[in-house]
């Protein structure tokens, strides 16, 4: 929850509150570059230590950072931009170990025949909390007037809510980390398979992940190409979308946050329907088709400035991304052993981050911030989704017949 609120609120804060989107792009570029090193190390931690303890530690880290910065804001009445950027970096670093750890933990305690159901439930849970975070971000960023106009309809409410300061939002975020810590602390689980603790040095543990993927080339190709849509989602949600809403749609923070909510609702529906529609045997075909649909939606947004169409495109992209994630993780669960999955996922992550660094470096160029030129960034995102699908297409039959290794 805290990750979702921060990841939504901070980009909009830089874009529409202090009007320093170029500075945010540079900070985002630096944070992403630093996460290259963290990503590899995080994977070795996931495979070496108790995954429950890792969850507890990262929630304490998030609580400490958010509470400290929030207190500074309350004391001084404002926050310098670099402290806001620091919170964003901290949130990204937590995000980058949270999901590899979550999936490794899920595989560890789940019977093979339940992989698809569990990955769907994880996606539903994740997107539900993100949808709630989107709603909170919309309310906290923009506030709520007692009278407002939306989609051609006038609404009258018996109350109003003022827009919150960024440090007040951070205080809410800090409390969610504390709640998460309390819930996770009480979780008890029984692993389906004994965890093979690797106590070798860092270099040796990293090499093990590379060695596995070198021996399983198809898994390496699949693991990276199937992340193409995710690559665009992260870049679009944290950097391109705030500029697009502000410069192309000429709308405010409410539209930005509702767009994210639309994305989450689409993802939530995909969480319930993906396994029923595609099944485990059609995962590769589904990922290819959904990647192309996502590409089409980016082009759709580049060619239209209607707000409702923007929400619809976000809805479909969210559904495509969630369905791809479910099918991708289920496939990897069947083909990567639990004792190495943290490191394998960290390698996929680092490669994805490398592409993201290059992409952000391009999108921070002044060209994309002149007038409505941000639509060219959407065209680039569409091309990336299409390339991911085209890489998987020639490998379709081989991937479908790839034997399970666990």
Predicted regions and their residues:
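Helix-loop boundary and gating motifs at the non-cytosolic
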Residues: 1-36, 215-263
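Transmembrane alpha-helix termini and helix-breaking/packing motifs in multi-pass membrane transporters
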Residues: 11-16, 70-75, 132-170, 358-378
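C-terminal transmembrane helical hairpin of 12-TM major facilitator-type secondary transporters
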Residues: 284-324
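Substrate-agnostic recognition of the 12-TM MFS/MFS-like secondary transporter fold
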Residues: 1-7, 28-46, 50-62, 83-144, ...
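Juxtamembrane intracellular "pre-TM" segments in multi-pass secondary transporters
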Residues: 189-224
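Cytoplasmic membrane-interface "Motif A"-like loop-to-helix N-cap segments
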Residues: 48-62, 278-291, 373
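Helix-loop junctions on the cytosolic side of multi-pass membrane transporters
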Residues: 162-166, 170-200, 392-405
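C-terminal ends and interior cores of transmembrane alpha-helices
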Residues: 60-77, 292-305
């Amino acid at each position: 929850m805290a990750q979702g609120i921060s990841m939504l609120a901070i980009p909009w804060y830089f874009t529409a509150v202090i009007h320093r989107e170029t500075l945010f792009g540079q900070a985002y570029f630096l944070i992403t570059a630093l996460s290259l090193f963290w990503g590899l190390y995080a994977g070795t931690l996931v495979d070496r230590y108790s995954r429950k303890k890792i969850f507890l530690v990262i929630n304490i880290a998030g609580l400490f950072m958010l509470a400290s910065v929030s207190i500074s804001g309350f004391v001084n009445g404002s926050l310098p931009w670099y402290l806001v950027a620091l919170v964003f970096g901290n949130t990204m670093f937590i995000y980058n170990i949270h999901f590899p750890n979550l999936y490794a933990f899920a595989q560890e305690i789940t019977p093979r025949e339940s992989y698809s159901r569990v990955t769907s439930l994880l996606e539903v849970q994740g997107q539900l909390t993100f949808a709630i975070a989107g709603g909170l971000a919309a309310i906290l960023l923009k506030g709520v007037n007692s009278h407002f106009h939306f989609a051609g309809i006038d609404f009258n409410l018996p109350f109003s809510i003022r827009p919150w300061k960024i440090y007040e939002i951070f205080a809410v975020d800090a409390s969610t980390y504390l709640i998460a810590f309390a819930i996770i602390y009480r979780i008890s689980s029984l692993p389906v398979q004994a965890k093979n603790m690797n106590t070798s040095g860092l270099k040796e543990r990293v090499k093990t992940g590379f060695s596995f993927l070198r021996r399983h080339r198809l898994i390496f190709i699949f693991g990276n190409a199937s992340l193409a849509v995710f690559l665009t989602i992260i870049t679009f949600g944290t950097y391109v979308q705030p500029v697009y809403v502000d410069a192309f749609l000429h709308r405010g923070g409410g539209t930005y946050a509702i767009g994210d909510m639309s994305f989450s609702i689409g993802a939530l529906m995909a969480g319930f329907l993906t396994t029923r529609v595609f099944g485990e045997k059609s995962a590769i075909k589904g990922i290819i088709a959904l990647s192309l649909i996502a590409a089409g939606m980016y082009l759709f947004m580049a060619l239209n400035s209607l707000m409702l169409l923007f929400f619809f495109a976000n809805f479909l992209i969210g559904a495509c991304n969630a369905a791809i994630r479910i099918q991708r993780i289920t496939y990897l669960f069947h083909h990567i052993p639990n004792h190495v999955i943290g490191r394998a996922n960290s390698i996929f992550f680092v490669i994805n981050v490398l592409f993201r660094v290059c992409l952000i470096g391009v999108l921070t160029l002044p060209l994309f911030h002149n007038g409505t030129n941000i639509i060219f960034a959407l065209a680039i995102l569409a091309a990336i989704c299409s390339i991911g699908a085209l890489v998987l297409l020639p490998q379709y039959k081989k991937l479908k017949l790839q034997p399970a290794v666990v």
